[in-house]
Design a protein with these regions (language model features):
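Conserved ABC ATPase "signature" region
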Residues: 123-141
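Catalytic Walker B motif of ABC-type/P-loop ATPase nucleotide-binding domains
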Residues: 170-174
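Conserved ABC transporter NBD signature motif
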Residues: 65-75, 82
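Conserved ABC ATPase signature
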Residues: 145-149
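Helix-to-loop junction immediately C-terminal to a conserved catalytic motif
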Residues: 57
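Conserved catalytic motifs of ABC-family nucleotide-binding domains
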Residues: 166
């Protein structure tokens, strides 16, 4: 009997394996994200985070296992249509935007998952784009070319673009990379607001920095060498023993008013 629509998971991965030539990138990963959950994917460089995201967005075909996003199974559905229901913020999107593209056009393109628009969007689309830019506190940048935006401004514009299609899932891929300390702090404040800006939105935040994990995140997936070391509620997963195994060094984990911090024991 089919599962009721309200209970369909946002993501459901079962024994997912990705290999290219002789290299195994993901090793039998199983993972599930329910509507409204806010996940962190934490892992060192080379752990398989980028390959997992590429698979989730249909750009990397699994070698074996099953992958379902918003009830659609990879290999049985049109992933091009599905991408419109997934908001993606990350370097892969930013790299495709032409320097001359105005911020307003960048956001407007998010409605249909397009980049570098070649014709003027409909008035309703432009109105939505302006509203989202204002919501993200960059309404005054609508006419500014992409190439003239700071890194922090670009991240806000990209989030506005990602929200333009009214997604059920928002993926933030290493979104703090390249930000100076002030811009990073401001960006994390924005991330903290996202659940209120769009209630019910499932969020996947990818990082290898423990200090970027905010209280709004409810769950964590720890990835190392293509395998899941742990996955579940934050309180059950984010523990010194698991993080020591994740990073290959004994670590101390502390949580203060400013958030989490990680120290290598014996430094």
């Amino acid at each position: 009997m089919p599962r009721p629509a309200a209970q369909v998971p946002v993501l459901e991965v079962s024994r997912l394996r990705i290999a290219r030539e002789a290299k195994v990138i993901l090793r039998g990963l199983s993972w599930r994200v329910e509507p409204g959950q806010h996940w962190v994917i934490l892992g060192p460089n080379g752990s398989g985070k980028s390959s997992l995201l590429a698979a989730l967005t249909g750009y990397f075909a699994p070698t074996s296992g099953t992958l379902a996003v918003l009830g659609e199974t990879f290999g049985r559905s049109d992933w091009r249509e599905l991408r419109r229901r997934i908001g993606l913020v990350g370097p892969s999107v930013a790299a495709m935007i032409q320097p001359a593209e105005p911020a307003l056009a960048v956001v407007a393109g998010g409605v249909d998952g397009l980049i570098n628009l070649w014709r003027r969007p409909k008035p309703a689309t432009l109105a939505l784009a302006r509203r989202l830019l204002r919501l993200l506190k960059v309404g005054g940048l609508a006419a500014r070319p992409w190439g003239h935006l700071s890194q922090g401004e670009r991240q806000r514009v990209l989030i506005a673009r990602a929200l333009a299609s009214d997604p059920a899932l928002l993926i933030l891929d290493e979104s703090c990379a390249g930000l100076d300390p002030v811009a990073r702090a401001e960006f994390l404040v924005l991330v903290k607001r996202l659940p209120k800006l769009k209630p019910g939105l499932a969020i996947v935040f990818v990082t290898h920095h423990i200090e970027e994990i905010l209280p709004v995140f409810t769950h964590a997936l720890l990835l190392r060498n293509g395998s899941a070391l742990a996955a579940g509620r934050m309180a059950d997963v984010l523990k010194p023993a698991a993080l020591s195994k994740l990073f290959g060094r004994k670590v101390r984990l502390t949580k203060g008013r400013a958030g989490w911090s990680l120290d290598v024991a014996g430094k």
